[in-house]
From Swiss-Prot:
It comes from the Bacteria. Part of the 50S ribosomal subunit; part of the 5S rRNA/L5/L18/L25 subcomplex. Contacts the 5S rRNA and the P site tRNA. Forms a bridge to the 30S subunit in the 70S ribosome. It comes from Clostridium kluyveri (strain ATCC 8527 / DSM 555 / NBRC 12016 / NCIMB 10680 / K1). GO terms for cellular component: ribonucleoprotein complex; ribosome. SUPFAM superfamilies: RL5-like. One of its GO terms (biological process) is translation. Keywords: Ribonucleoprotein, Ribosomal protein, RNA-binding, rRNA-binding, tRNA-binding. The keyword RNA-binding applies. PROSITE patterns: RIBOSOMAL_L5. This is Large ribosomal subunit protein uL5. NCBIfam families: PRK00010.1. The lineage of its organism: Bacteria, Bacillati, Bacillota, Clostridia, Eubacteriales. It holds the Pfam family Ribosomal_L5_C. The keyword Ribonucleoprotein applies.
Length: 181
């Protein structure tokens, strides 16, 4: 099953990147490697049921069961014990990744209130892009009546690009709505 974004990458994005950056071989063109979605649930230390609903939300949004993230060490001030479940994350690759990216860029982000584009300053220097979302309600699969609490999430686009400029161009060609200066 070939996806719209994957076809767009092969037919439009790669030739455009090769022109702009002067690559000799199509394998030199940067590509999307994976998308990691993380949901930190701090309240989970007091109420484990909260984590269940976060896992549920993430499963509905991504179509893949999340892995629980656990505390690396105990911190007394936060009443946190080592190995306590405090969040969940999903790593999407291949078709799931393209499906999610397509849904995020074309459906979810335009539904954000007062949306004027995502920041282009969130690159890490190695060609990866991070994005924070304040509420899970922007995804059409989440029903407003069925959520117990509004939760945010971190989304990281991992690319094979060597520089931020290459990664930004890759995401821009995919249709990421960067804010206009």
């Amino acid at each position: 099953m070939s996806l719209r974004l994957q076809e767009k990458y092969e037919k439009e994005v790669v030739p455009a990147l090769m022109d702009k950056f002067g690559y000799k071989n199509i394998m030199q063109a940067p590509k999307l490697e994976k998308i990691v979605i993380n949901m930190g649930v701090g309240e989970a230390k007091d109420n484990p049921k909260v984590l269940e609903s976060a896992v549920n939300d993430l499963t509905i949004i991504t179509g893949q069961k999340p892995v629980l993230t656990r505390a690396k060490k105990s911190i007394a001030n936060f009443k946190l014990r080592e190995n306590m479940a405090i969040g969940c994350k999903v790593t999407l690759r291949k078709q799931y990744m393209y499906e999610f990216a397509d849904k995020l860029m074309n459906v979810a982000l335009p539904r954000v209130r007062d949306f004027s584009g995502v920041s282009d300053k969130s690159f890490d220097g190695r060609g990866n892009y991070s994005l924070g979302i304040k509420e899970q309600l922007i995804f059409p699969e989440i029903e407003y009546d069925k959520i117990d609490k509004v939760r945010g999430m971190d989304i990281v686009f991992v690319t094979t690009a060597n520089t931020d400029e290459e990664a930004k161009e890759l995401l821009r060609l995919f249709g990421m709505p960067f804010a206009q200066k």
